[in-house]
């Protein structure tokens, strides 16, 4: 009798594990906007590189799923996910209340503040008084765009939206905008520490608004894909525990990008 009960328990456990595994797609299409170094961009050979790309590849390997990347502008990623043109978003996507009304997120992958980048000889600060009459570049579909349109645009500050972060920096260096407003880490590693950004700096402190900027970034998923989300969260927790996350992060950052 005990042997029969044990056999039944093993069968049930195996069936549950098999069902959970079957619920995870064998192939996943991951949407990304490759204009946001060091998280996602293209190298000289046209290959996708960056911290998000490395994280996604490792997560896919751990859940035994074949992943392909689909390039899209940031503001097209959530509509593409909901329309089932892609299965996940890995593109430095902030976990915000507004976005959580539309999609689900994995656990936090890393954190970053939002800051202005200005010329070194500029005294621009992230205040209405300092920015009034100025032109501020933002990436379409970002929390920075939302903040700018809600808090700055009504007070005489021109918010200029772009489809690629590289275009923002090009216009900043050409003098067509007065400041760029983006993720602090992306600005530091992808622009300020590069030769093209040598004449630029952060303009003032970080802009804080937890409701708009969220509590960190995560992988975006459809709300109904619970098994996939749970599998990714489990894999990510294992990466944090076994040192893989830290190893990948050190390729790009000289500080704790995960945050508190």
Swiss-Prot record:
InterPro entries: Lys_Arg_Orn-bd (IPR005768), SBP_3_CS (IPR018313), Solute-binding_3/MltF_N (IPR001638)
Effect on the protein of changing residue 42 to E: Increases ATPase-inducing activity and histidine transport
Keyword Disulfide bond: yes
A GO term from the CC aspect: outer membrane-bounded periplasmic space
Cell compartments where the protein resides: Periplasm
Residue pairs linked by disulfide bridges in the UniProt entry: 60-67
UniProt signal peptide: 1-22
SUPFAM superfamilies the UniProt entry points to: Periplasmic binding protein-like II
Residue ranges of the TM segments: none
Listed GO MF terms: amino acid binding
Record note on what altering residue 176 to D/S does: Strong decrease in ATPase-inducing activity and histidine transport
GO biological process: amino acid transport
Keywords: Amino-acid transport, Disulfide bond, Periplasm, Signal, Transport
Binding site for L-histidine: 91-92, 94, 99, 143, 183
Outcome after substituting residue 40 to K: Decrease in ATPase-inducing activity and histidine transport
PROSITE patterns in alphabetical order: SBP_BACTERIAL_3
Record has Repeat as a keyword: no
Summary of the function given for this chain in its UniProt record: Part of the ABC transporter complex HisPMQJ involved in histidine transport. Binds histidine. Interacts with HisQMP and stimulates ATPase activity of HisP, which results in histidine translocation. May have some additional function(s) in translocation that is independent of the stimulation of ATP hydrolysis.
Subunit structure: The complex is composed of two ATP-binding proteins (HisP), two transmembrane proteins (HisM and HisQ) and a solute-binding protein (HisJ).
Similarity remark: Belongs to the bacterial solute-binding protein 3 family.
Entry text on domains: Has a bi-lobal structure; the two lobes, one bigger than the other, are connected by two short strands and are in contact with each other, enclosing the histidine. Both lobes are involved in stimulating the ATPase activity of HisP.
Record-given protein name: Histidine-binding periplasmic protein
Upper taxonomic lineage: Bacteria, Pseudomonadati, Pseudomonadota, Gammaproteobacteria, Enterobacterales
């Amino acid at each position: 009798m005990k042997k029969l009960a044990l056999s039944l328990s093993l069968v049930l456990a195996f069936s549950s594990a098999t069902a959970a595994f079957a619920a995870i797609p064998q192939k996943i299409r991951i949407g990304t906007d490759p204009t946001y170094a060091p998280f996602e961009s293209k190298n000289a050979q046209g290959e996708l590189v960056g911290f998000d790309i490395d994280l996604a590849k490792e997560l896919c390997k751990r859940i035994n799923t074949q992943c392909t990347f689909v390039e899209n502008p940031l503001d097209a990623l959530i509509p593409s996910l909901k329309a089932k043109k892609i299965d996940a978003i890995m593109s430095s996507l902030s976990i915000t209340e507004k976005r959580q009304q539309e999609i689900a997120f994995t656990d936090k992958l890393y954190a970053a503040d939002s800051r202005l980048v200005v010329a070194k000889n500029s005294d621009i600060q992230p205040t209405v008084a300092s920015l009034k009459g100025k032109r501020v570049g933002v990436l379409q579909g970002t929390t920075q765009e939302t903040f700018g349109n809600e808090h700055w645009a009504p007070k005489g500050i021109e918010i200029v939206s772009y489809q690629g972060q590289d275009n923002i920096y090009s216009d900043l260096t050409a003098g067509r905008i007065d400041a760029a407003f983006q993720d602090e880490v992306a600005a530091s590693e992808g622009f300020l520490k590069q030769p093209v950004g040598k004449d630029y700096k952060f303009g003032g402190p970080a802009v804080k608004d937890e409701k708009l900027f969220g509590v960190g970034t995560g992988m975006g998923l459809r709300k109904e894909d619970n098994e996939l989300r749970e599998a990714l969260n489990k894999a990510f927790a294992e990466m944090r525990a076994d040192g893989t996350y830290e190893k990948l992060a050190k390729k790009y950052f000289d500080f704790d990008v995960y945050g508190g």
